[in-house]
Structures are given as C-alpha cells and as structure tokens.
C-alpha cells in the first residue's frame, strides 16, 4: 500500500531537499527519474530501486518492527553506537580513506 513520490515538479517546484537523501540512497538514474517525472512509485519499485529494504503487509508491520527493535536492542549498545557512527562517517570519505578509517574503528 505504501507509495513514494517527489511531486514538486508537478506543481512547478523542484524537490531539492528530498533530492539530497534520495540521491544518496538510489542510483542517479532512479533519483532523476523520480525527481523529473514526479510520478508515484509503489513499494515493489521502491524496493527494486533500493529505497526500501523490505515490504511488509500492513497487518504484520508492528510485529516486524518490534522484532527488529528487539533484535537490535539485544546487541551491545556500544557496538551499535560505534557501528552507526562509523557507517555514516565512512560514507562521506574517499574509498581509501574509508578503509583506513574503518580499520581503526
């Protein structure tokens, strides 16, 4: 049932702010398709684009989210914190720098 869209172009605007996150999570071609057409995509297409990682039927959503939360909460909070910080830090680095950085984490 979920749909995704960057509709600004449909009303004479460009979705500049959503473009930042979109362009960092899907291919350039897919981002431009969404940004330039303003068309709505369904969950299956969003998954194909890499915008989402899983499609869950509405009736199971709370159960699935709860399971993810429990699984993550069962891990070391320090490891999760360190891992998240490293993930986002290395994403902005050149490849060689990212490997050097993560080798020290």
Which residues does each PLM region occupy?
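CoA-thioester-processing core
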Residues: 1-34, 49, 64, 68
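Generic anion/oxyanion-binding catalytic loop in active/binding sites
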Residues: 11, 20, 35-36, 54, ...
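Terminal peptide-recognition signature
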Residues: 22, 46, 83
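C-terminal long alpha-helix characteristic of the crotonase
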Residues: 2, 52-104
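Short loop/turn segments at beta->alpha junctions
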Residues: 27, 42, 57-60
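Acidic, divalent-metal-coordinating active-site segment for phosphoryl/phosphodiester hydrolysis
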Residues: 38-45
């Amino acid at each position: 049932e979920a749909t995704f869209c960057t509709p600004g172009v449909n009303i004479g605007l460009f979705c500049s702010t959503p473009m930042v996150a979109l362009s960092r999570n899907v291919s350039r071609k897919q981002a431009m398709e969404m940004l330039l057409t303003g068309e709505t995509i369904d969950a299956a297409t969003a998954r194909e684009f890499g915008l989402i990682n899983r499609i869950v039927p509405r009736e199971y959503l709370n159960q699935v989210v709860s399971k993810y939360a429990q699984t993550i909460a069962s891990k070391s909070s320090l490891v999760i914190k360190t891992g998240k910080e490293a993930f986002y830090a290395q994403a902005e680095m050149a490849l060689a720098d990212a490997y050097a950085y993560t080798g020290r984490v």
